[in-house]
Amino acid sequence: MTCIVVVDNHGQFTHLEGRALRDLGVDADIVDNETPPEEVDADGVVLSGGPDMDRVGRAPEYLEADVPVLGICLGMQLIAEELGGAVDSGDYGGYADVTVEVETDDDPLVGSLAPETRVWASHADEVTELPDGFVRTAGSDVCNIEAMSDPDRELYGVQWHPEVAHTEEGEAVFENFLAVCADGA
């Protein structure tokens, strides 16, 4: 059975990420972000959202785990910042129902959502500059970089929350990530 580890960065929806994955029939374990990656045996990693980059613990170490990684909200920001991109305060903070335009239908993570989808956003900061190797795969009027991908390294991020019911095609994001994990297994 596929095993996905959700690294808990103290986000308000982390438990929903684990539930969404379990509902898709995979073994999903939520681990504290102080858990060393070498203590985890997984086919993929989800870096959860959270309130503050100063509280991500050892989560950045999971970027070297040699398995696909999906960053959600703060998790995406963590990927960008750790790999040389930039994160800054967004113009629109708080909660919002957002229409996201998907750039291409061939992206492994969000391509199936093209040309657009409605999502639930809950963030004050956002990725403002992509790290080398990443492409912008979705954007919106409130956040220029809503999703990013580096398929060669199997690193992906979404600024929105696919795990909440307000995100119309959130389950598809997790299904697509599981397909990436299965391809790499």
Describe these PLM feature segments:
Residues C3-I72, Q77-L83:
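Flexible gly/pro-rich beta->alpha loop and the following alpha-helix that scaffold active-site loops
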Residues V56, E61-A65, L70, Q77-E168, ...:
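Pocket-forming structural segment of enzyme catalytic cores
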Residues D23-L24, A138, N176:
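A short hydrophobic/aromatic micro-motif that marks alpha-helical segments and, especially, helix-coil
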Residues R22, T104, C181-A185:
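Secondary-structure transition/hinge residues
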